[in-house]
Amino acid sequence: MKKIILAGGCFWGVEEFLSRINGVVSTEVGYANGRTENPTYEDICTKNTYFAEVCLVNYDENIISLKELLAKFWTIIDPTSLNKQGNDVGSQYRTGIYYVDSSDLEDILNSKEELQKSYSKKIVTEVKPLENYYKAEEYHQKYLKKNPNGYCHIKLD
């Protein structure tokens, strides 16, 4: 089982999209690479904590490779938009790929470099090791499964 943490704006839609991919075993939303300990949703929205809303993805690399997973991820974000996805604006909505296994870095950078060829604007999606991660509150987990008509900046169908 492999793990990658992906930030693509509001984590509700990112989680729903990723959870539908064959080979993704489990997903969880949370807050990553911020400046404080144990942040709440209110903290990341109103204070200068610099956490990103993220989706932690556990996947079976025998079914889907990181390269394939990232290719799907790139389709749901605007990688050239800094701190904004859809109508959501703020550093918590930045795009990012946070890795826990340093052997994944080469595949991540190659994927980003390949994608850059199809954009005239610079890709601003950050690629960093995971520094910290806190699971989001329970009401955020599988939000769009619990609230099928909930807000989502991603076209899921």
Swiss-Prot record:
Oxidoreductase as UniProt keyword: yes
Taxonomic superkingdom: Bacteria
One Pfam family hit: PMSR
Enzyme class: oxidoreductase
Entry-linked Gene3D superfamilies: Peptide methionine sulphoxide reductase MsrA
InterPro entries cross-referenced by the UniProt entry: Met_Sox_Rdtase_MsrA_dom, Met_Sox_Rdtase_MsrA_sf, MsrA_MetSO_reductase
GO cellular component: cytoplasm
One function term, GO molecular function aspect: peptide-methionine (S)-S-oxide reductase activity
GO annotation, biological process: cellular response to oxidative stress; protein modification process
Enzyme nomenclature, EC number: 1.8.4.11
Catalytic residues as annotated in Swiss-Prot or TrEMBL: C10
Catalytic activity: L-methionyl-[protein] + [thioredoxin]-disulfide + H2O = L-methionyl-(S)-S-oxide-[protein] + [thioredoxin]-dithiol; [thioredoxin]-disulfide + L-methionine + H2O = L-methionine (S)-S-oxide + [thioredoxin]-dithiol
Keyword terms of this UniProt record: Oxidoreductase
Stated family: Belongs to the MsrA Met sulfoxide reductase family.
Annotated function: Has an important function as a repair enzyme for proteins that have been inactivated by oxidation. Catalyzes the reversible oxidation-reduction of methionine sulfoxide in proteins to methionine.
Protein name: Peptide methionine sulfoxide reductase MsrA
Organism, as annotated: Clostridium perfringens (strain 13 / Type A)
Gene: msrA
